């Protein structure tokens, strides 16, 4: 079983590391090509392209400039410990045991606009380059054209290595769009998280993102390998709703806290 999650905009390169083990990203040659393109952008162009403040644009221009092809624990940190958005609040990788990291390294992948696919222990230098950004490059008009089949092929390699054919899609639509489902050698299962609001169940972005992290942690902690085991997910009040689910979609609901 291979879990897919999105990266995060918020990064943490200060907190103490809970493991010293690391691996290197497998698609660094591609990342270097994107850095070459990104370095051509001025801070105002970055601000416009990414729809971010001038201050953030300056920070990210500096990140592109400072990026080096040689990754070390001094200039990079493990991706699963560097990302700090809502998904990662639910995942809480900073509390993983070494055995948890082992399982995650085999079964969890983070999709990335710059790095393509990251394993949890892959070193990552700080960046911001969301998958949906229209960064023109030698392969096309945006990052989807740049990555083409590369991400899908890398996921197929991971599936073949574990001898499995199930992908748990906990990534956002923006990121999963970089995967070619018809070329993926797997059944795709998509958990959906609905929270009650004023008597109706709907997707509430913040809660749904955190729930994707909670589900990832549930799979890793319990060493789950079969999709039917996911129905036991009950973290923070969620429960499986079989009536609302279908073959490819597992629906989990949570009542409003009153």
Swiss-Prot record:
Pfam families: H2O2_YaaD
Gene Ontology cellular-component annotations: cytosol
GO biological process: response to hydroperoxide
NCBIfam families registered for this protein in UniProt: PRK02101.1-1, PRK02101.1-3
Family of the protein in this entry: Belongs to the UPF0246 family.
Identification of the protein by name: UPF0246 protein YaaA
Source organism: Escherichia coli O6:K15:H31 (strain 536 / UPEC)
UniProt lineage: Bacteria, Pseudomonadati, Pseudomonadota, Gammaproteobacteria, Enterobacterales
